[in-house]
Amino acid sequence: MPAEWEPHEAVWLAWPHDTTSFPYLEEAEAAFASFIREIHESERVELLVLDAAMKERVVAMLRVRRVELSRIRVHIRDYADIWFRDYGPIFVVNRPASQLAMTKWIFNAWGNKYPTLLKDNQIPCGMNESLRLPIFEPGVVMEGGSIEVNGCGSLITTEQCLLNPNRNAGMSKAEIENYLREYLGVRHFIWLREGIAGDDTDGHIDDIARFVNPTTVLCARQPDENDPDHAVLEENFRLLEAATDQDGNKLRVVPLPVPGWVGDEQGRLPASYANFYIGNTKVLVPLFDTENDAAALETIQSVFPDRKVVGINARYLVYGLGTFHCMTQQQPAV
């Protein structure tokens, strides 16, 4: 499994449409369109829409934003939600043979929390009708947002998610590691504990800690001891500081600011600057109209000297309980 900063052929997305997930749908669509505008210049966009009417409306929105439509491929598919990172395939590469393949894991809507979203488990097979790639199916439950790799053999994940009985009940840590070795080509595992408050995925790593190069990890840190995320994130930070890469080298762990409390009267939302997407030439970062937005952009730019870091307001997108990394799945170039 390549690291996210390795070259992409395309990025896969699914246009938001459900007002249950996105009560501020118009604002969420605007953030989504802004994301496409920024990313399409350096990697092709493969975009799912529900029907011809949605396609026409979406194309019009992108045209207004001066998106080069020849770089957008629109696919009409039946899908429930936009979280491609979790229900989409995880692409893998055989570098000596220059061959691309996909691994198709079982998506059970984060522990069967949302029965209406279970149909998104079929998206990878639908994609492969046109891609026609070799497809490998481990037969176990896993979401792309629960793992983070450096492309050299190391993988970071959380016990809260991968060992959760609502995913693969009865499966041991060693058994899960064996599946990850066999299907993703990793050999070294860094297990963190738990995720952030408001995260319905049971502790996905892409809201906590992200590799930015083979030996450097950005890790969210909450200095406010009264915040429920403080203790959790401090423990994760300490675990990363004590960890090594696949060759036994210590990792450089860089603290990443957190937005703080983002939400409404119904509760806290899983807002995290760590949910950025690493494109071919840009890193797209979710912003939340909080005092730490600027500091987060500065921190992320410092670890990506060869890419432009772009912030996009995702305050209304996060009502769907995710942002840019959650909604994307990169297709590696071979």
Task: Give the location of each predicted region.
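The feature marks the mature, well-folded catalytic cores of soluble enzymes
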Residues: 1-334
